[in-house]
Amino acid sequence: MAKNIQAIRGMNDYLPGETAIWQRIEGTLKNVLGSYGYSEIRLPIVEQTPLFKRAIGEVTDVVEKEMYTFEDRNGDSLTLRPEGTAGCVRAGIEHGLLYNQEQRLWYIGPMFRHERPQKGRYRQFHQLGCEVFGLQGPDIDAELIMLTARWWRALGISEHVTLELNSIGSLEARANYRDALVAFLEQHKEKLDEDCKRRMYTNPLRVLDSKNPEVQALLNDAPALGDYLDEESREHFAGLCKLLESAGIAYTVNQRLVRGLDYYNRTVFEWVTNSLGSQGTVCAGGRYDGLVEQLGGRATPAVGFAMGLERLVLLVQAVNPEFKADPVVDIYLVASGADTQSAAMALAERLRDELPGVKLMTNHGGGNFKKQFARADKWGARVAVVLGESEVANGTAVVKDLRSGEQTAVAQDSVAAHLRTLLG
């Protein structure tokens, strides 16, 4: 007997019971994006490897350890996308979307990183990302954060996420801070773990992200990034904070928040939760004004964020059990008796024409009334439409409310109107 082939570790199947809640959550997210005037862009999941090395940074964990990179049959180095911003910028440059234009874009889909799989962290995971190009003021940074806050309200999780903000300044200010931080770390090298010692010279700001308690204690005495900000970055950050306060959005300034990718400048932010154990970041982003030029385009201000959908689904299920998937079926059409199936299928097609958007399932495979009503219940139907031999003969159908148990005989020409009233 052949051995079963299973999914790759960390790359999960999502079954019908799970995809229903995903679809409802994604629908909520997309509705909010539409209300802000953002447009969808669809991007390839495979890109040329140099794109990510140039955008993310060659000495980041993502590039050094986590990317799925391979050579194709032409010998070209390709990579499964580990994040969406680089590909979105590449597409914007390639198709002339960015020069002297303002763009508000969003995308959704799978990303890939070779990490140790655990709850909320997978090797194939799904992100929804937003990217805005051509706007440089703090007002658009604030709008993105306000958009995410509207998501949390719509999903019923506002009380379980908190906003952390920081400014990492201009490239020049960050370089000055990097020198001061390295000088401090060199004085305390014996207190650093091996990972931090390596990062100290390759990407010292990432030491601020260390989860090692001893390193975190040491960093209490380290130079503060805020002390090295240029005046323009200070004004930008102050403007952002004022806008958020006016909008009633609470935040905490976290001077150790730097983000893990090299392309960020000025604003960085994260929405975090205590409800998912160690996987606390739900949504994160910031400003990356130099990335378009770095990837071959003209200098273009840009800001964006990405959100992990697996973590969002886990969070919604953990803290808002009232947020349930929509039922698979609204109406179940029951047919019993000789020669009723063709009449039932014809009625079902007519009802689909007259009730667009309503989910109607026709019984197949026979079965008595009891079995068919059990199937209707299994699929979550609110209403059953019943056709027996007598109903077919006299041109009627029985409409049964499966919640109250009330049923009414209705002329087939009036079934759609009756259902419209019943379903609200």
Curated annotation (Swiss-Prot):
Cell compartment(s), UniProt: Cytoplasm
Name this polypeptide is given: Histidine--tRNA ligase
GO BP annotations, alphabetical order: histidyl-tRNA aminoacylation
Organism listed in the record: Escherichia coli (strain K12)
Swiss-Prot/TrEMBL keywords: Aminoacyl-tRNA synthetase, ATP-binding, Cytoplasm, Ligase, Nucleotide-binding, Protein biosynthesis
Superkingdom, natural source: Bacteria
Gene Ontology MF terms in the entry: ATP binding; histidine-tRNA ligase activity; protein homodimerization activity
Family to which this protein belongs: Belongs to the class-II aminoacyl-tRNA synthetase family.
Quaternary organization: Homodimer.
GO cellular component: cytosol
Main location: cytoplasm
Reaction equations catalysed: tRNA(His) + L-histidine + ATP = L-histidyl-tRNA(His) + AMP + diphosphate + H(+)
UniProt cross-references to CDD domains, sorted A to Z: HisRS-like_core (cd00773), HisRS_anticodon (cd00859)
EC number(s) stated in the UniProt entry for this protein: 6.1.1.21
InterPro entries in the record: aa-tRNA-synth_II, aa-tRNA-synth_II/BPL/LPL, Anticodon-bd, Anticodon-bd_dom_sf, His-tRNA-ligase, HisRS-like_core, HisRS/HisZ, HisRS_anticodon
Pfam families named among the record's database cross-references: HGTP_anticodon, tRNA-synt_His
